[in-house]
Amino acid sequence: MGEPKPVNFRHELKYLISSAEVTMLRTRLSGLISLDAHAKNGHYTIRSLYFDDYDDRCLLENENGTDPREKFRIRMYNGSADRISLECKRKERGMTHKTSCPLTREQTEFLMAGKIVPNVADRPPLLQKLTAQMMTRRLHPVVIVEYERIPFVYKNGNVRITLDTNLVSSSDVSQFLRERIPHRPVMPLGQQLLEVKYDAYLPDFLYQSLQLSDLRQTAYSKYALCRRYTR
């Protein structure tokens, strides 16, 4: 057997920005680095279904800055069920690590209903892990989070810079697989989100390109905000 792969934790910085700053950064970054190949029209829509227990432990850990902490979500793109994945995002010592595995539509429907996927012993380890926590902690789906993402990538440093706009949420988790879902906006008008992710270092020219007059790092969480707005 080969050696296990090392767990790759990444830096993840978040900033609240204005819609005008989104336009400015999009123009600036377009002249420096490439759009993600999956952004066929310059952007794509991300929809995530998050899990929590009946004590809202994931929400409270997020708001309290508990370290380490992790949360599970199911993710799809552009309202299409052709590509669905289960993800677990772990935060530890200020760094983040994400693991994922594909899901079928049938598996997703079981999880949406808070049910255990059949024959889970034959499934990927991540799905087995979620199943165990559904049984022991009673994890269940609690909120849908959706937004549009403009993603830029740069190979050196494995950099990913994203401009996330039009954040909306829904507590009707049964609608997750529909092409369009009923939702409500959760951000103040004109407020958007910048995320910067990288491995060991952020190239200086990219750091300089991100400088805005009042850019301030935040511990902002899409999940926590959407939970608060959909209660």
What are these regions (language model features)?
Residues 1-231:
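Phosphate-end processing signature that detects enzymes handling 5′-triphosphorylated RNA
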